[in-house]
């Protein structure tokens, strides 16, 4: 997948985000990363045994910690348009 100015412009419109030009150049570099990841799809893994975990006994568990978090407010503060606890975006499906 080639990430170019045209694709970025389309994604910018669909996501209702505004990407600055200097940030735009950085995002175009994602094309190289995506191309590398696409090469991974070319690997023949049919002869490889499926593994779930490299740690004996599974992944170590962690203790759940209760934290007071205002994640919703923090995320909505970044939105160009919001209404109550929702993002406001233009209709894209007719």
Swiss-Prot record:
One of its GO terms (molecular function) is glutaminyl-tRNA synthase (glutamine-hydrolyzing) activity. It catalyses: L-glutamyl-tRNA(Gln) + L-glutamine + ATP + H2O = L-glutaminyl-tRNA(Gln) + L-glutamate + ADP + phosphate + H(+); L-aspartyl-tRNA(Asn) + L-glutamine + ATP + H2O = L-asparaginyl-tRNA(Asn) + L-glutamate + ADP + phosphate + 2 H(+). Pfam families: GatC. The keyword ATP-binding applies. Allows the formation of correctly charged Asn-tRNA(Asn) or Gln-tRNA(Gln) through the transamidation of misacylated Asp-tRNA(Asn) or Glu-tRNA(Gln) in organisms which lack either or both of asparaginyl-tRNA or glutaminyl-tRNA synthetases. The reaction takes place in the presence of glutamine and ATP through an activated phospho-Asp-tRNA(Asn) or phospho-Glu-tRNA(Gln). Heterotrimer of A, B and C subunits. This is Aspartyl/glutamyl-tRNA(Asn/Gln) amidotransferase subunit C. It comes from Campylobacter jejuni subsp. jejuni serotype O:23/36 (strain 81-176).
């Amino acid at each position: 997948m080639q990430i170019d100015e045209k694709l970025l412009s389309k994604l910018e419109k669909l996501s209702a985000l505004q990407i600055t030009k200097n940030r735009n150049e950085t995002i175009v570099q994602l094309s190289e990363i995506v191309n590398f990841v696409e090469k991974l799809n070319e690997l023949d893994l049919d002869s490889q045994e499926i593994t779930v975990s490299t740690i004996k006994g599974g992944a170590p568990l962690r203790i759940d910690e209760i934290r007071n978090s205002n994640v919703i407010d923090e995320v909505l503060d970044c939105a160009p348009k919001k209404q109550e606890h929702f993002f406001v975006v233009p209709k894209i499906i007719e």
